UniProtKB/Swiss-Prot annotation:
Protein name: DNA mismatch repair protein MutL
Primary role: This protein is involved in the repair of mismatches in DNA. It is required for dam-dependent methyl-directed DNA mismatch repair. May act as a 'molecular matchmaker', a protein that promotes the formation of a stable complex between two or more DNA-binding proteins in an ATP-dependent manner without itself being part of a final effector complex.
InterPro entries given in the database record: DNA_mismatch_repair_CS, DNA_mismatch_repair_MutL, DNA_mismatch_S5_2-like, HATPase_C_sf, MutL/Mlh/PMS, MutL/Mlh/Pms-like, MutL_C, MutL_C_dimsub
Record-stated family: Belongs to the DNA mismatch repair MutL/HexB family.
Kinase is among the record's keywords: no
GO biological process: mismatch repair
Species this chain originates from: Rickettsia peacockii (strain Rustic)
Lineage of the organism: Bacteria, Pseudomonadati, Pseudomonadota, Alphaproteobacteria, Rickettsiales
One GO location term (cellular component): mismatch repair complex
GO molecular function, a single term: ATP binding
Amino acid sequence: MTIKFLSESTINRIAAGEVIERPASVVKELVENAVDASSTKIDIILERAGKNLIIISDDGIGMTDKELEIAVERHTTSKFDESDFLNINTFGFRGEALPSIAAISKMLITSKKRDADKAFQIKLIGGNEKQVTISVHNEGTKIEIRDLFFATPARLKFLRADKTELAATVGVVKKIALAHPKISLSLTHDGKNLLKLKGQNKDAETNLKQRIIDVIGDDFIKNAAYIDFKTPDFSICGYTSSPTYNRASSEDQFLFINNRPVKDKLLQVALRVAYQDYLARDRYPICAIFLQINPQLVDVNVHPAKAEVRFHDPNYVRNLLIEAIKNALTNKSHVTSTTIASDALELFKNPLVNKQSPVSKVINVNSKSADYRPTTHSTLNTVPQNHVCQKLIDTLSHAKIEQEVENHIEHEQQTRKQYKLGAAKAQLHTTYIISQTEDSIVITDQHAAHERLGYEKIKDYLKTEELIKQRLLIPEIVELPNEKKADCLYDHREKLYKLGLTLEKFGEKSIIVTEIPNILGDVNVQKLIQDLADHLSDFGKNIALTELIEHVTETYACHYSIRAGRKLSADEMNALLRQMENTPLSGQCNHGRPTYIELKLKDIERLFGR
């Protein structure tokens, strides 16, 4: 076969294969064109998730008849100066979208230039039969795409179910909406309105906040830290969730470079690193983060879809993003997720019914230990009764609540006002500390809280020097499940020595431990070594030192911390609460779980119909 030139229609279909993968790709390209056209209102209509019909209408600057003819040709654009290719500020610039879409669909474009007398229309079928005619239309542009991929039926086979394709399109529209809070956007599918977002016209921070509430939700804003970070060439702003407010996937992570939504591995890794001290490895933060960068320091022309970028100095960008996120999280360091308390209260919000219900007499809880037993000496006949509340009362009626705090009332009131986590009042099930503030009660998980305190303490110590070792009076021999785990620990023995642990191989599956970190005190060495082996065996010999330190520090913190089941005195409980108030990120343990929940008095009163 001889070498020959491809036809224009074939070239366009090949280009479409790079740019247009699914209906969501069409919506992305056309809506971004509308944004570049200075639109303030964009409406999107879909049928069968865009497979049958896609209509994009805007109130942008519009096109003349001459511009319409040129716009559907390849490599035509009005969006940048050829002499300044490195300074691109628009979304589109390759001049490929319209001809690529036209090549695989039936396209109708109607447009009217601002302040023009006439509107014009152009019709294309498979990229051919270009006819420009006079039409009637408001200022702006309307593009109709019918029978997507009719000219490339093989591509149709790769499309997913309507529900999946629609979800992809909704995701695309949400990203564009977040990047442009001043633009009103609507999305309708098969006659049903899915999104209706009003343009915001206040200051930039307020606009962004309201658009995030509209797109991601009010709960996210309530549980997010605001990012505001600037250097001469970079600015980073947006919101990122508290560690306790997380997801099982990275689906709700929205990252933007110069308002362009991107899916960049470098930024995703930076996000993971910023949260590595606060989240379990299978949990993901939620965020909407916007990086504004000098256009000459980033290349957006890496791929036709423009979802990937290349930075002039990637490590610098990575470190800046990590620093910006960590600074924001530190400023919100003592806050736990507000939804935790709401979820707890929801358990009690069963429909209330009026029924005969006994009301117990007042119990004096000032004694060192008081039994709570409801009695029936009441003249009240109709009290709203919540089934879940009653279940809790029934459980507590058989338990002793240890009253550990017997300070003077005046001192207690002062403590409640002075400290965020209040004054310790009791310990439940030797696991949870109950404390009281001016307007709430706080329930603290003593193990999770102390684990975070220990983690921060050990981490700070490792920044300055090696951990002090304590020699075991009798060396501990630890037998592991298999030789692989024993070999893994032995392979890392030099690094572990710097982290306060001295060990040697003892047979095929055993390790002998002679020294442990002094900070761990009277620790269960058997359990410590087994947990370390479990952590490290998954990574083998190639684990980086920083990652090894992270794993070891997590394990140490867990074994250093107060265990559930340990009885604490009033002074010990208050000391723990005061330490939490003075420790960064004490609102969650190392795995992203909350260390405490706060129940507001007004919410508790609502449970009792007050």
